Each structure stands twice: as structure tokens, then as C-alpha cells.
Amino acid sequence: MTRNWTESYLGVYREPEGSVRDSLSDHAEAHLKWRVLNGAFVSGEKIREAALAKELDISRATIREATRRLAGAGLVEIDAQRGVFVRTYTLEQIEDISEIRRALCSLTASSFVSRATPTDRARITDMFDRLEAADGRAYEPADYVLGLLFNEAVVRAANNERLFTLYHEAWQQMRIFKLFLRRHVFGAVDVQAHNHSMFSQGAVHRRTLYQAVLSGNEADIADAMRRSADHSLLRAQEQFADYLAATQSTWREKIVSTRTPSGNPAGG
């Protein structure tokens, strides 16, 4: 089955339906991607192929095909001996990914200026107007999705399939890194709280990007996109520092809990 790259298949926008509309491998991939990008499986966690195949009522071979696709997108790692795991990224790798994302901003901006159609621009304006309307009421989970779609619409308007793919791979990899940190800092992944936080923090960057799009100035568009990328990396670095503090604190507590009041190891 050939995909239409202009249709969103991120897997974070809505939970896959129970019925199979596409191929079985697409169906399996959608379910896996949804769970990885929404914190059901976090970095380092093993994906139980047999259990998943039984749950979705499809073969393990189909699950394996889906995991191979996700491995190509940098979401999972396949070990021939140990199985399939959600990919774990180091902070250094995330910084490298962010550097690539920054470099793509200039190409996105130049392609947008030369290739965006009136329909593309109208779609961006419509989404931004809906985002502005959302500011006047209480936050809803769908608002986060709309924010993603707005940013995606700008990249889509560059009308470059490979650029679109690279943009989303970088976004997805950053997301699973942050969800992993959140799990280890808070002990659980509250995806709705995470999405709400991301939506609120992104408001100023969306407004700056929209103003740049209206101006049609290539440098302004690139700068607005880089500012957003830089902010995302900064938040990842801050969350990583929180993760280090939390894990070190937990380790110290474990050491203390195994010692008697005299300071000797318990049972010694």
C-alpha cells in the first residue's frame, strides 16, 4: 500500500480504531506508534510481540513487519537475541537531532516561500485562527493536536516529502526522550498533563511563526522555526537535569534504607 505523505500518520493525533481499514501491518504500526508516542511503552521497555499479536488478532510476522518500520523511524530497536525495545536516546544524541532540526529550518523556510500554494496558506491561517480562539476558553486535549497540525501545516507547505519525514522523525524522537524522562521523574507518564504543558509553552512560538508566514520573509520564517527548536531542546536539557537529580536521589535513598542506624549495612 502506497501512503499519501500529505496525510498525517504520526500516530499521536488519535487512537487507532479497532477495525482494520488499511493493511494489517499498517494497523499494527499505528497501534504501536500510538502507544510509544503516548507513553504506554517508554524507552528501554520491551515490546511483547506475542501478547500484542494476540491482542490485535494478527500474526507475529505482521507485528515484526510493523516493528521494522518503527525501527527505521528511530522509535524502536531490534535485538536479534533479546527482542524489540523502545529506543533509548542519550542527551548527546538528542542534541545532535536538534542540530539537524535547526539546519532543516532554513530549507523549510526557503521551500515554503517558493512552493507554498494559496491553499497551503489558507490552511495555516485557518488553524491559527482556531488556536487563537482556543485561548479564550479552558484547555481541551484537542488543542494540543491542533497545535501539532499547525506546525505540520507549515512544513507540509514546503511541499518536500523527504523534508516532511525528517521533521517528524526528529519530533517523534524528541517526544519519546521527554516521555522517558517524565516517567522516571514522576513515576508515571501523565500524557495529558505533558501535552497541556507542551501546548502552553508553544503558544508564543506559534504566534511568532504565523507572523513570519504572513510576512513571507524567508529569514523570519527560518528564525521562528529555529527559536521553537531551541526551546524544545532547552526543555529537554532541563528535564534531563531533573531526571539526573531524581535518579541520584532515589539511589541515595536506597543506600540509606539498607543501612542500620549505626551506619553498617543491614544484616552485616
Predicted features by range, described:
Residues 2-9, 20, 180-268:
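C-terminal all-alpha effector/ligand-binding and dimerization domain
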Residues 89, 169-170, 177, 235, ...:
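Residue-level signal for well-ordered alpha-helical positions
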